[in-house]
Regions:
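A conserved P-loop NTPase coupling/switch region
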Residues: 31-32, 36-59, 149-151, 171, ...
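Short, flexible, mixed-charge glycine/proline-rich loop motifs
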Residues: 916-925, 959-964
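Histidine-centered nuclease catalytic patch
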Residues: 932-966, 983
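Short Cys/His-rich Zn2+-coordinating modules
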Residues: 907-920, 948-956
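ATPase nucleotide-binding head domains, primarily ABC-like/P-loop NTPase cores
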Residues: 259, 547, 551-580, 584, ...
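Short Cys/His-centered divalent metal-binding micro-motifs
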Residues: 965-985
Length: 985
């Protein structure tokens, strides 16, 4: 019972430290076991353990239940626990001291690393949030344990608790998809913590979330570590420990003094990972400080609203066309796919960086497909590098590395004379060589291959996993003592074989048949090595020795003298006897001992080699950068040619301003044109803010562009399913691709880079549990109004669709006026035709209206969609056209149309027979206002004033009420004419 009491004590401590989703695994002999009580809270835990690991629960001790598995299956069950979101605390037995156990590892979803995992990354993140008097500050830190890369970010936002408050946090989570998240909050209620997990998608990607209240010591066992993470003395010590003594001089780390909460988050996270597995933070890279990057801000959940990545409902198993990332990711290596995702999700604002990508893509456009078969052979070199740093790389991995080095060397030799590629590699290398005589990639590959091949037999390494005793794979000449042992071992085996052959010959003297190998060399893990034969044959052997009067014989090339008189034949199994003697026992023992010594030395040589290989990390980083860059280049060239994308043109800023704009010709939606292969995709031309001076340039060169009088905003009208939202998304996707350095799905695109994209596309409210569509819309609109500039792109779909019409129209028009005043680029899909006649809308001179039409073809009984943008708002009765296609009753449709004509129809749709004649002249009808053409006429105005008429009602020679002297006007125009005497529109 003392063992079980110790188990429960350690388990209680583990749960208090690592959270309620924690299991303790204790090694007992050859098994790892988990215990619980037959009743009480511990019973539920053991039942959950058995369910997760698919194990049976045993009741061998009264009041105690247990479950377990063999020690060699530890990694298998650790993986099951990680997938289910549990932390496993493992206590293993000491190999030398009986009944002595110690903590051997803590494994959680974000700190578990295995070479067999097919995932591109495994991240653990720490989010530190604090609500202050007037703002909310969020510090974020992330570590990818597969690659050793880390990143940090800090944002200050409004105090309001709403989805848009956590926009940057949502982007951070979407970009890194951590499997484990630590949430440290201050001044947050439990409900608010639950909300922000839903708002940001933490609940969708993280298998384990630790919620720690920085202000409540009674509910937080880690409060001491949280408080220490705030103190600079601990921060400096941790940075120096994990990033080296020169960390304080690093540009990125020096920035931490300006970003307090990001520093605290990274400090706590580094300590958290170190306590789980110290090897995981060994030689991790200095963090990328995202606040200092030139990335474009993708606000209001743009990544998901534009389908750049799968939304929460897009299953991870979604097809190639479930997101832009999946469609465009044609990388052949895990490293390439990992870095391509980072690039696509963090588009740049730097024109120079974009131009560099366009130039190299143009240079390599038709050559990189030849690289794809070679790149497909490469394994995850970043993960290999981390496993080497962690000393967890098996010989099989070195065999794969050996082959990969040959592929990389071949690739490098193929492009070594290509000056533009060489310049690009140097410009994009985060750690360029520090000396002029630094080794080239091909030289590094050749040297490492030589080192591997001269140390190990690479063919044998291919079959050696984590058990280094499977075979001897170290080459001769590496260790003299190993070579001596091998010779001794081989001699002993040869002698044993010669003894067996001699005994075989003696037995066969008494046999009628001449079967070979009647004496077997039998080997077991527990029993060791021995000679065995059947009982009948061992009797024959004894008879032959006696008959021939044999006592001692010299056997083998080394003339081993074997004493036959001391042979005995104890029972081995039911059918066999063992053939043994003191001399044979010593020979067999020497074979076992020498074999074990060989295994020990092989393991020692291998461990020393891996330690030596760890010193080559700069060279590994050089190879990783080269292989990753080659894969990224082939990917961007491959998708450009495969999908017929074009090179974007970046417009330069000139004296007319620096406002962002775009001019897209032949714009396509890259996903829809792949999904709908039955019809040809209808491309559109869309240009906003491009100016009269826009030019497509030559060869993608930067060209000057004036602002001109081109519209900077657009309203798109049309029924649902006609393609409004798809067109809006296509614009956002094209801009993101262009600023990520990719070719775009257009026939041409000229643009000036944006710093921010805001989106508001319907269907987003499912992200925010408990909030209505209208609340979400207004939260996102608030952010747009507060942050939009003339370098922002706003993409909206049916804004204000979640409230009643009067409020919707008012809010929408006010929003358009604000965006027009700011000078940003904006597009909205809308059904609000009534705003076309508003004075406030008429004043928006840099906003245009377009429409996509749909009509019902009665003869074909089908809706005909014209997906080409047309000028103006178009007809306002497309809903009735859809109703016709659905065969609603004719009487119903006629009544609906009558209601529309009476209350909602624009003047142009009202029949002439509905117009009333003027009381001045029955031949003059009060139809549509002849001045503005947008309202029905309420007044009839005399062009030559009535006051000038004589007693005969003539004005000069013109009758006062002549049709030519009468003008039908709406009330507003009538008032304006009397005030200004201006009859023009």
């Amino acid at each position: 019972m003392s063992l079980i009491k110790e188990y429960f004590r350690l388990s209680t401590e583990a749960v208090a430290k690592y959270g309620p989703k924690t299991f303790l695994l204790m090694q007992v002999g050859a098994f790892y076991e988990c215990y619980g009580e037959t009743s009480g809270p511990n019973r539920a835990a053991i039942d959950e353990f058995c369910r997760t690991c698919e194990l049976a629960c045993a009741n061998k001790t009264p009041g105690i239940v247990m479950a377990g598995f063999r020690d060699y299956s530890l990694e298998k069950y650790l993986n099951k626990l990680q997938e289910a979101g549990y932390t496993a605390v493992v206590h293993s037995q000491d190999a030398q001291i009986k009944d002595e156990r110690a903590l051997s590892g803590v494994y959680s979803p974000g700190t578990f690393m295995t070479g067999e995992s097919a995932a591109l990354s495994n991240c653990v993140a720490c989010i530190w949030l604090e609500r202050m008097r007037s703002k909310t500050v969020i510090g974020m830190a992330n570590i990818d344990v597969f690659t050793g890369r880390s990143s940090v970010f800090e944002v200050e936002t409004e105090l309001m608790h709403a989805p848009t408050t956590y926009d940057e946090l949502e982007r951070f989570i979407s970009a890194h998809s951590p499997s484990e998240v630590i949430l440290i909050t201050d001044n947050f209620s439990q409900r608010m913590v639950e909300d922000l997990q839903n708002y940001t998608g933490i609940t969708d990607c993280a298998r384990l979330v630790h919620v720690l209240d920085a202000a409540n010591a009674t509910t937080n066992a880690n409060i001491n570590q949280i408080q220490k993470s705030k103190r600079q003395v601990y921060q400096r010590e941790i940075m120096a420990r994990f990033f080296g003594a020169s960390a304080s001089a690093s540009h990125s780390l020096a920035s931490f003094t300006s970003y307090e909460f990001a520093t605290q988050a990274l400090t706590y996270l580094l300590n958290f990972v170190h306590e789980h597995n110290p090897h995981l933070v060994h030689r991790i890279t200095e963090p990328v400080f995202e606040n200092q990057s030139d990335r474009m801000v993708l606000a209001n959940h743009s990544l998901k609203q534009l389908n750049i990545i799968d939304d929460d409902n897009g299953a991870k198993s979604g097809g190639k066309c479930s997101s832009v990332y999946k469609l465009l990711n044609n990388c052949m290596t895990p490293m390439g796919a990992r870095h391509f995702r980072t690039r696509l999700l963090n588009p740049s604002c730097s024109a120079a960086k974009m131009q560099r990508e366009y130039d190299i893509t143009d240079h390599l456009l038709l050559t990189t497909d030849a690289w794809r078969p070679q790149l497909a052979q490469l394994k995850d070199l970043e993960k290999f590098n981390r496993l080497i740093m962690l000393r967890k790389c098996p010989p099989q991995m070195l065999h794969a590395l050996y082959g990969n080095l040959a592929v990389i060397e071949e690739l490098h030799l193929a492009i070594v004379e290509d000056a533009p590629v060489g310049a690009y590699l140097h410009a994009t290398n985060p750690l360029p060589p520090t000396t002029a005589n630094a080794e080239s990639v091909s030289d590094v590959c050749a040297r490492l291959r030589h080192l591997l091949n001269t140390t190990f037999d690479m063919d044998r390494c291919a079959n050696v996993g984590s058990d280094l005793g499977e075979c001897d794979f170290v080459r001769s000449g590496i260790r003299a003592d190993l070579d001596t042992l091998r010779a001794k071992h081989a001699g002993a085996i040869k002698t044993l074989g010669a003894v067996r052959d001699f005994l075989d010959s003696l037995i066969l003297c008494g046999e009628k048949t001449k079967a070979a190998d009647v004496v077997k060399i039998h080997e077991t893990e527990k029993g060791g090595i021995s000679l065995q034969a059947t009982k009948r044959r061992t009797k024959l052997l004894a008879d032959q020795i006696k008959r021939q009067g044999l006592d001692k014989v010299c056997i083998g090339a080394d003339n081993c003298c074997l004493s036959l008189s001391t042979l005995t034949y104890p029972t081995a199994t039911g059918a066999n006897n063992e053939i043994t003697s003191p001399q044979l026992s010593e020979l067999c023992r020497s074979i076992i001992v020498s074999n074990q010594k060989i295994k020990d030395i092989v393991a020692q040589v291998y461990a020393e080699f891996v330690d030596k290989l760890r010193d080559s990390e700069p060279e590994f980083q050089q190879l990783i950068h080269f292989a990753t860059t080659m894969d990224l280049l082939q990917n961007q060239c491959h998708i450009a040619t495969k999908y017929k994308f074009c090179r974007p043109t970046i417009a330069s800023a000139n004296e007319n301003g620096t406002k962002s704009f775009f001019d897209a010709r032949g714009l396509r939606h890259c996903l829809i044109e792949r999904l709908n292969e039955d019809e040809t995709y209808v491309a559109n031309d869309v240009a906003l803010g491009s100016g009269e001076g826009t030019s497509s340039g030559s060869g993608g060169a930067v060209v000057p562009v004036g602002e001109g009088e081109q519209p900077r905003g657009m309203l798109i009208y049309g029924t649902n399913a006609v393609g409004k939202t798809s067109l809006i998304r296509a614009i956002g996707i094209a801009i993101i691709m262009a600023q990520a350095g990719l070719y775009v799905p257009c026939s041409s695109l000229t643009f000036r880079p944006y710093t921010t994209i805001f989106t508001r596309i319907l269907g987003n409210d499912n992200l925010f549990k408990g909030l209505s569509t209208f609340q979400v819309e207004m939260s996102e609109l608030r952010i747009i109004l507060r942050m939009a500039t003339d370098r922002s792109l706003i993409l909206g779909d049916e804004l204000c669709s979640g409230t009643e019409m009067d409020s919707a129209v008012s809010i929408f028009v006010a929003g358009l006026a604000h965006l027009h005043r700011v000078g940003c680029t904006f597009l909205f899909a809308t059904h609000m035709h009534e705003i076309n006649g508003y004075d406030e809308v008429r004043l928006l001179t840099k906003m245009c209206m377009k429409h996509l039409t749909v009509v019902y073809d009665k003869a074909r009984d089908a809706l005909i969609y014209n997906r080409k943008l047309a000028d103006g708002p178009g007809a306002s009765m497309y809903g009735l056209e859809v109703c016709k296609s659905l065969h609603l009753p004719d009487a119903f449709l006629e009544f609906a149309n009558a209601v529309r004509l009476r209350h909602r129809a624009p003047p142009s749709d009202i029949g002439i027979l509905s117009f009333e004649p003027s009381h001045f002249n029955a031949r003059k009808l009060k139809g549509v206002c002849e001045r503005c053409s947008s309202e029905l006429a309420q007044e009839v105005h005399h062009l030559l004033p009535q006051k000038d008429a004589d007693h005969m009602n003539y004005i000069g020679h013109v009758p006062k009420n002549h049709v030519a002297n009468l003008m039908a006007l709406c009330t507003r125009c009538h008032d304006e004419v009397h005030g200004t005497h201006n009859f023009n529109k």
